[in-house]
Regions:
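The feature captures the LRR N-terminal capping module
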Residues: 1-226, 230-246, 253, 257, ...
Length: 294
């Protein structure tokens, strides 16, 4: 249904047309002063409203939860854009023009049909947050390794089978979410992510952790649930900041003594492994107040 007169929430600098059931956008909605924020979340738009491109000062654009099959090649005209959310659409390609969005800090591409991301994405040197979950990525896009300011990367629910050796270049990364992919290993170079606080690789096929894993000394939350781990490296005892460790549904039958060195650990989940008896190393952890499930 086309709403000829949608219920607008407009100020001098912003336009909010969320949840109006719009299939098209009336030109009159975007006339007037240059807008800084436009939100068209949760409508039925099949085509990107090209009138948006006239708002050269636009800083925030939310066009998520529509039915867009493509993004405009001229998206680069919005050079002041700091946040772009085009998640939950039907697009299969990110236009090369995205390289012009040099002010972009937040980019949401989740739940589309992307099989890769363009090399031009690597020019977004201010990007701090990238979400490309629920797509069809079969490998880590090379452009991501150029995003030196990136602090949070969410790529879960894809088909990624490996991480490149260059992954360690993301020195600012604080959160990495890769659950529900096809990883069989983590590269040694992951130890170079010295700022990493959160690592979630649940539901992959990881058979072992690299010996360098203990260098992730700022890690506080580690989720390794539903993988194929048969043992843990001794270096795991170096993760002194760790507060939560989820090892459910692996193939562990023993634990390294170094685990007792995790004095900040508050929660340890070991259910659905292969322990014949309670590992002795758990006693000091329980004594210090760690909640252990086994």
């Amino acid at each position: 249904m086309l709403h000829q007169h949608p219920q607008q929430n407009r100020t001098a600098q912003s336009l909010d047309l969320d949840g109006q059931g719009l299939e098209n956008l009336d030109d009159a909605c975007l006339q007037g002063n240059s807008l800084l924020k436009i939100s068209l979340y949760d409508n039925r738009l099949r085509q990107f409203p090209r009138q948006i491109l006239q708002h050269a000062d636009l800083q925030v654009l939310n066009i998520s939860c529509n039915q867009l099959s493509e993004l405009p090649t001229e998206i680069g005209l919005l050079k002041q854009l700091a946040m772009l959310d085009c998640g939950h659409n039907q697009a299969n390609q990110v236009p090369a023009g995205i390289r012009e969005l040099r002010e972009l800090t937040y980019l949401y591409l989740s739940d589309n049909a992307f099989r890769d991301l363009p090399v031009e994405l690597g020019r977004l040197h201010k990007l701090r947050y990238l979400n490309a979950t629920d797509n069809q990525l079969s490998e880590m896009p090379a452009a991501i390794m150029q995003l030196g300011a990136l602090q949070e990367l969410r790529l879960y629910n894809n088909q990624i089978a490996s991480l490149p050796e260059t992954f360690g270049q993301l020195s600012a990364l604080r959160e990495l979410h890769l659950m529900n992919n096809r990883l069989v290993a983590l590269p040694e170079q992951i130890a170079q992510l010295s700022a990493l606080r959160v690592l979630d690789v649940e539901n992959n096929a990881i058979g072992q952790l690299p010996t360098t894993f203990g260098r992730l000394v700022n890690l506080t939350h580690l989720n390794l649930r539903t993988n194929r781990l048969q043992q843990l490296p001794t270096s795991i005892g170096q993760l002194k900041a760790l507060t939560t460790l989820d090892l459910r549904a692996n193939q562990l039958s023993a634990l390294p003594d170094s685990l007792a060195e995790l004095t900040q650990l508050q929660r340890l989940d070991l259910r659905w492994n292969n322990f014949a008896e309670m590992p002795a190393v758990l006693a000091p952890l329980i004594a210090q107040g760690c909640l252990v499930h086994i």
